[in-house]
Amino acid sequence: MADTSKDIEELIGIMARLPGLGPRSARRAVLTLIKKRGALMRPLAETMARVAESARECVNCGNIGTGDLCEICMDVRRATGEICVVEDVADLWAMERGQAFKGRYHVLGGTLSALDDVGPEDLRIPKLRARMADEGITEVILALNATVDGQTTAHYIADELAPTGVTLSSLAQGVPIGGELDYLDDGTISAALRARKSL
């Protein structure tokens, strides 16, 4: 029984390292898994083992898939002239949930950061330049987060790609759908005002 308790505590500790899960949430999740081991824990463990073996980074865009190329890069229905640049895979998946973009993606793998000593060579920026030439890209949409590092990265990429003559754009920033002005920070309101459009 002591070994089992140790294993359970180890599982809780591992779960607590996941983003969004603290010790209390991890403990609840583990208890649920144990109570529903046939319906949840075993299928989860089997699926995690398969994903651990098969998941890999797409050699083209940086998305996560199970082959050398992800499903998006293999989809011939995707617009080939547009590429949406995102910081990480979670951002790509968020864009896909919106179902508005029908082109291809490029995952940078982070942002430029002087504090964290991350330079252009540490990101997938050289691969982006190579894809521009190889794939005949005509428009690059910079969908980077509105953080200092995200905006610094966007400006760097824009400066790098400007000589190519490609159309460069970024996502609009401002008031979210359903948002109330009273609850927004000053920077968001300023960005929304600058990005206003005619009706």
From Swiss-Prot:
Pfam families tied to this protein: RecR_C, RecR_HhH, RecR_ZnF, Toprim_4
Q: Where are the zinc fingers (C4-type)?
A: 58-73
What superkingdom does the record give? Bacteria
Q: Does the keyword DNA repair apply?
A: yes
UniProt keywords, alphabetically: DNA damage, DNA recombination, DNA repair, Metal-binding, Zinc, Zinc-finger
Using the record's annotation, list all stretches that form the Toprim domain: 81-176
Q: Which GO terms describe its molecular function?
A: DNA binding; zinc ion binding
Its GO biological process annotations read: DNA recombination; DNA repair
Recorded hits in InterPro entries, A to Z, give:
DNA_Rcmb_RecR, Rcmb_RecR, Rcmb_RecR_Znf, TOPRIM_dom, TOPRIM_RecR
User: What function does this protein fulfil?
Assistant: May play a role in DNA repair. It seems to be involved in an RecBC-independent recombinational process of DNA repair. It may act with RecF and RecO.
The entry assigns this protein to a family as follows: Belongs to the RecR family.
Annotated protein name in UniProt: Recombination protein RecR
From which organism does this entry originate? Jannaschia sp. (strain CCS1)
